[in-house]
Regions:
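Active-site/ligand-binding-proximal alpha/beta "capping" segment
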Residues: 98-108
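Conserved N-terminal beta1-alpha1 strand-loop-helix module at the mouth
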Residues: 1-66, 71-98
Length: 108
C-alpha cells in the first residue's frame, strides 16, 4: 500500500522481532521495494541489513556507532541516525551519516 501510494524510502522497524523474523521480513520487503524502485532501510540491526542486502540502516543512540556501521556496511550503503537533543544532532553532524533524524527535542 505504501509503495502503491508513491513512498520510495521505507524503514523496516520491528523492535519485538527476533533476528530470524526480522530477516524474513526484510527479505519480503526487499523484494517489494526492488520491484517498486524504492529504498529499504533496516532499523537498528546492521547484521540484518547486511545479510538481507538492504540499502542501509537507521541507528538509534544505543546502537552501533555510525563509524562501526560504515565499516561493516561499506561506503555505498545509506546510514541514518536518530537524535533527540541539540548535542546529539551536533555530534551526528561530525559523522559520515547520510541523514539525521530529529526526534523529540522538547518534551511531548
Amino acid at each position: 500500500m505504501l509503495l502503491n501510494g508513491g513512498a520510495r524510502f521505507i524503514q523496516l522497524r520491528d523492535k519485538e522481532a527476533s533476528a530470524r523474523e526480522l530477516l524474513d521480513q526484510a527479505m519480503t520487503c526487499l523484494e517489494l521495494t526492488r520491484k517498486a524502485g524504492a529504498t529499504l532501510i533496516i532499523n537498528d540491526r546492521v547484521d540484518v541489513a547486511l545479510t538481507a542486502g538492504a540499502d542501509g540502516v537507521h541507528l538509534g543512540q544505543d546502537d552501533l556507532s555510525v563509524a562501526e556501521a560504515r565499516e561493516i556496511l561499506g561506503a555505498d550503503k545509506i546510514i541514518g541516525v536518530s537524535t533527540h537533543s541539540i548535542a546529539q544532532f551536533r555530534a551526528a553532524l561530525e559523522t559520515t551519516a547520510d541523514y539525521i533524524a530529529v526526534g523529540p527535542v522538547y518534551p511531548t
